[in-house]
Amino acid sequence: MAAINPWASWGALTDQSWGMTAVDPWASWALCPQYPAWHVEGSLEEGRRATGLPAAQVQEPVTFKDVAVDFTQEEWGQLDLVQRTLYRDVMLETYGHLLSVGNQIAKPEVISLLEQGEEPWSVEQACPQRTCPEWVRNLESKALIPAQSIFEEEQSHGMKLERYIWDDPWFSRLEVLGCKDQLEMYHMNQSTAMRQMVFMQKQVLSQRSSEFCGLGAEFSQNLNFVPSQRVSQIEHFYKPDTHAQSWRCDSAIMYADKVTCENNDYDKTVYQSIQPIYPARIQTGDNLFKCTDAVKSFNHIIHFGDHKGIHTGEKLYEYKECHQIFNQSPSFNEHPRLHVGENQYNYKEYENIFYFSSFMEHQKIGTVEKAYKYNEWEKVFGYDSFLTQHTSTYTAEKPYDYNECGTSFIWSSYLIQHKKTHTGEKPYECDKCGKVFRNRSALTKHERTHTGIKPYECNKCGKAFSWNSHLIVHKRIHTGEKPYVCNECGKSFNWNSHLIGHQRTHTGEKPFECTECGKSFSWSSHLIAHMRMHTGEKPFKCDECEKAFRDYSALSKHERTHSGAKPYKCTECGKSFSWSSHLIAHQRTHTGEKPYNCQECGKAFRERSALTKHEIIHSGIKPYECNKCGKSCSQMAHLVRHQRTHTGEKPYECNKCGKSFSQSCHLVAHRRIHTGEKPYKCNQCERSFNCSSHLIAHRRTHTGEKPYRCNECGKAFNESSSLIVHLRNHTGEKPYKCNHCEKAFCKNSSLIIHQRMHSGEKRFICSECGKAFSGHSALLQHQRNHSEEKLN
């Protein structure tokens, strides 16, 4: 049966943790995280006796007035929309539960108003004189709640209780209403009840202390944090029995902010938060807390509260050191790792620091029969399992084997996670995008991509990161540390994953295979980028020109074309580059290194991309075909250049003379005409050229090499362009036509000379007689006449 307890209704308005299945006010109180949770067998009945509450009270009929929560107009105005909606839902649901259990009651006017969507405060009884008799009756009729009080130090069974601080909603209500007289009377009544409760609590705990503290599974211990809204701050100082093997600490049944434990043999300070998890309920499998939004049940009110925070967006956990807040305890529990070194478990005798062990576990070291010592480092462990795992880190022992693939692990938790890679199990799902993960930590990291949270900040440059591992690697930029060294070539890396990827260049391993075309890759990121070629996906867009890219690195490189940034500078000549790969390739021009060799002909190249393009020549594959003329090309860039012959596009323009070119290399060579630069020099005759292709063709005049042969007549040429022009003699093709007389030519140079006849231009002038000619060949013929005249 759902909750009909007034405390649950009020708790819903403060914590949004409603839905408890309890009728007994003591049971509800025990479940609520703001109050002590007596989950020792029989402690509820003892609690009733200690406070004078009759055990038979739970059998009396419950009226609507017993469970209703009222607000004044002033208080109602202080509630926001979410709180008002929650109040309306709780009141209507509570009234429905009363009817469902057979209570024959008339419908209260407040329920009628809430059902019609009207304000409830209009039906509340007026309180003009601020006497608040309704609240006094509620206080007298309900279970007594400890008020906010501070007690002097008391001694009992080796424990000293210094102070209690409790949150009390009824106390707050009286304080808001200004009921001073009722407040003073309330304090007097509560002080008596508190003394009875403290006495009863110590009696119970003196008998049960060893049971609680001996069960390590009953508590979830974390470092120096408390839920900011749910948990009251309670500060205890305990001194245990020196000869006892278990610690007597009554914090076992409540939340603790700071606990200081002292022992004559050891001195240790522990910052911990202890959360009761109700073992009896876990054993029976009962899920007492049900969420109406997701139809999900929980056996722990803390887990239920975490889950409700997902729906509401409420962030209930605050870390005291940095005041960062979280809506789930797992994320909250991981956060203290950022503050490593601040809250540590320090055991002075052995000077060991414990991050994962609680002081309750470590105290076992004090007894000889329970101490496990690792001789190598003189480190001591409270459990032999910890010793076994610790020893494995030095012996390289991996005792946890997986039979499917033969992989071994040091920790059993690693084995459990690894098994999920075989089963495909991904139980942790992102609420934002639906992406699933194998472990909770991966989900937590992923969620930061949605929230934008970057909690890990570099103390050197202030740069922030979403993941702690990224911060650790980033810090190596400042320190210059590269701890991962390749055993083959001695190259160092600051990422272990980079070393693993680098080692594949030595082994030739390519474990990542494309399911579409079968192509393999050394890096998973390369496979992911390759897969986008098949899908056409380009998720990375430039903000300047809206151009899209398959991977982020390509976008980063492209953005430098807008900014003009060239961060990579050559130390030899000072030349700068936008891309690091271009700098690496450029540096090989200084060293002469050509590490990429063709296995077919042995030709070497400075860049892998140049080798890949060259290898296509041997394969004969020409996958890129022109849709205009059907011509095939081995490279996409060649096809693009070829298509410009059809479109007439010449995108590369000279800023000196305005002449345009279809290829960028032609523009570069043309600019050297203006500058007079001829960087390509022949070693045989010292002749220089402004284009490398001209030098290559010239060298063949010395060697006599003519690699381009005509299949029709067998004539050979030293340039491919000369062969193309020659082939037109066999085919009769004359692609170059004059716009004036429609005359056609097989060579472009012949068309240019012909067009000068129409324009009258004669740019070639004889140096002997000054006569001008339209073509260079005509000038050469004329100059031969002068030579013959001189001979005669």
From Swiss-Prot:
It is found in: Nucleus. The keyword Ribonucleoprotein does not apply. Signal peptide: none annotated. Its main location: nucleus. A zinc finger (C2H2-type) spans 289-311, 317-344, 400-422, 428-450, 456-478, 484-506, 512-534, 540-562, 568-590, 596-618, 624-646, 652-674, 680-702, 708-730, 736-758, 764-786. Residues 62-133 form the KRAB domain. Keywords: DNA-binding, Metal-binding, Nucleus, Repeat, Repressor, Transcription, Transcription regulation, Zinc, Zinc-finger. One of its GO terms (cellular component) is nucleoplasm. It comes from the Eukaryota. GO terms for molecular function: DNA binding; zinc ion binding. Widely expressed in adult and fetal tissues. InterPro entries: KRAB (IPR001909), KRAB_dom_sf (IPR036051), Znf_C2H2_sf (IPR036236), Znf_C2H2_type (IPR013087). GO terms for biological process: regulation of transcription by RNA polymerase II. May act as a transcriptional repressor. PANTHER family: ZINC FINGER AND BTB DOMAIN-CONTAINING (PTHR24399), ZINC FINGER PROTEIN 606 (PTHR24399:SF74). Belongs to the krueppel C2H2-type zinc-finger protein family. This is Zinc finger protein 606. It comes from Homo sapiens (Human).
